Design a protein with these regions (language model features):
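S-adenosyl-L-methionine
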Residues: 1-35, 39-40
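SAM-dependent nucleic-acid methyltransferase catalytic core
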Residues: 1-7, 11-15, 70-223, 227-232, ...
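Conserved S-adenosyl-L-methionine
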Residues: 25-85
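Short active-site oxyanion
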Residues: 26-30, 48-49, 196-202, 252-258
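Short, solvent-exposed loop/turn segments at secondary-structure junctions
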Residues: 37-40, 56-59, 149-152, 208-211, ...
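Short loop/helix-cap segments at secondary-structure boundaries that form the rim of catalytic
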Residues: 41-46, 214-217, 267-274
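Conserved beta-strand scaffold positions in the cores of enzyme catalytic domains, especially
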Residues: 50-52, 203, 277-279
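Long, positively charged, glycine-interspersed low-complexity recognition regions
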Residues: 229-231, 236-320
């Protein structure tokens, strides 16, 4: 079991074992629709066809960089943690402007091809491409620091905490290994993967209805952890009431299996009353400072019997 490399709003660290134990007994494609920090993905056993998706492009860019450019990512992080609110605010302002690569790159390349010799153009193209790639890395490192040093991993308010650098880098390397761990895909699977060939977890940046339509099949298993009802403003990507209804409509029509985690409230219970609903209670990690021992109630919703996997496991015989 591998830990996620970042904390995250609504992360499933405390629920991951409960959830994994209730996966369907059989499926051949695993898709995380609202990937977030990927706590469930990192905790589950690697499988041959896995997809990490999130509508937040900062998250998916960071996952892509950790998977494909870990050395550059670690180098960009450096050994200098943020020590003040002023440093955090400066980085937050820079990140919001999304100024991570050279402006007018396409126009520059077109003009260079006209006015430079072939040899000079190749050298110039390599330089520009390298700088653009570093822009992705810089963006990923900045986003990582914002999440790591913000209150409740929200990325908006400073909450500096001591950092174990060795442990941080070890977690990043383990994440890199996990994202590259599963099997090489066949030509047909690469086509289904949306043109993402090769070994490892497929990383996508799409809306939930698009990603579900792309991968749905009778043997696909979707795990979904959407913004919880009533807490949508805590997330960078807006999730409206209409989207909660749309998610229910989409899930009601799929061919595959789904597992959905939500906060326990009457609205969600009524919305998904036609499916299996399993309650779960965990420590409320955000409120522990003010209400020690406070609990948070959640729901696990599935379109299959969530006890099937548990029932299918062999029971240990005893002589007592």
């Amino acid at each position: 079991m591998v830990n996620s490399m970042i904390p995250w709003i609504g992360g499933k660290r405390l629920m991951r074992e409960f959830l994994i134990a209730r996966f369907p007994p059989y499926y051949d494609k695993y898709v995380e629709v609202f990937g977030g920090a990927g706590w469930v993905l990192f905790a589950k056993k690697p499988e041959r066809f896995e997809v990490y998706n999130d509508a937040n492009s900062n998250l998916t860019n960071m996952f892509h960089v950790v998977k494909h450019k870990p050395m550059s990512f670690v180098k960009e992080l450096g050994f200098l943690p943020l020590n003040s609110r002023a440093e955090f605010d400066l980085m937050l302002d820079w990140h919001r402007k999304q100024d991570f690569s050279l402006p007018y790159q396409t126009e520059e390349m077109a003009l260079a091809k006209i006015y430079l010799s072939p040899i000079d153009f190749r050298e110039y193209k390599e330089l520009i491409t390298t700088q653009a790639e570093l822009g992705d890395v810089r963006r990923a490192a900045t986003f990582y620091k914002l999440i790591r040093y913000s209150y409740a991993a929200g990325g908006n308010s400073f909450n500096g905490q001591p950092v174990n650098i060795a442990q941080t880098y070890r977690t990043i390397w383990l994440a890199n290994r996990r994202l590259n761990e599963n099997g090489v895909k066949s030509d047909s699977e690469i086509l289904m993967a949306g043109g993402n060939p090769g070994k490892g977890v497929i990383i996508q940046n799409k809306s939930f209805e698009v990603i579900i339509a792309l991968y749905d099949s009778p043997t696909t298993f979707f795990y979904l952890d959407p913004p919880y009802f009533g807490t949508e403003k805590q997330y960078e990507e807006l999730f409206t009431l209409e989207l909660h209804y749309l998610l229910r409509e989409v899930l009601g029509k799929i061919e595959g299996f789904f597992m959905l985690s939500y906060n326990d409230c009457e609205f969600i219970r009524e919305l998904y009353k036609d499916f299996y609903i399993t309650p779960f209670e965990r420590l409320n990690s955000i409120s522990q400072k003010y209400t020690p021992g406070g609990m948070f109630k959640e729901l696990v919703i599935t379109n299959y019997d969530p006890e099937l996997r548990l029932k299918s496991q062999p029971k240990q015989l005893t002589l007592l």
